[in-house]
């Protein structure tokens, strides 16, 4: 059964780029999939830091950042789409999962089945600036997206490996080690892969 014909849902999974994936935006990338359905997929690259720190980002949007533990953390390159827009991947706040009109913590939050949330509204940055807000965050500029059937085609062409997401890779593993750490979830190391390898 091919990926194109199988009904799969890879929400809350990692996509791990195979060595043969030559697109510069995705080479050696680990993508956390926030959403995957028959309409397409949306994810954030979690292992490609930019030169911008969170303190620099907060300065740019005229907010102070009281949490010193976050100030030196990098902003990540989340993907090639809307690279001027920020995306905050974080642990859900206690009242998320309700719509904004029902009192959700932030104006624009997607609660991801599996234990994370992604917020695109500035209010999450405002909460972080005061020392409130989510405890653990990863902030990207831009995101990655695939149209309906596009990701399935790339999987069938062996462009990606997939594995259920492990939050420790996102929040507890240094960025340069995330690719190898994600592979280790499959029991693999980089030297075991070849550009023409199949699916794990």
From Swiss-Prot:
One of its GO terms (cellular component) is cytosol. InterPro entries: AlgH-like. It comes from the Bacteria. Belongs to the UPF0301 (AlgH) family. This is UPF0301 protein Veis_1517. It comes from Verminephrobacter eiseniae (strain EF01-2).
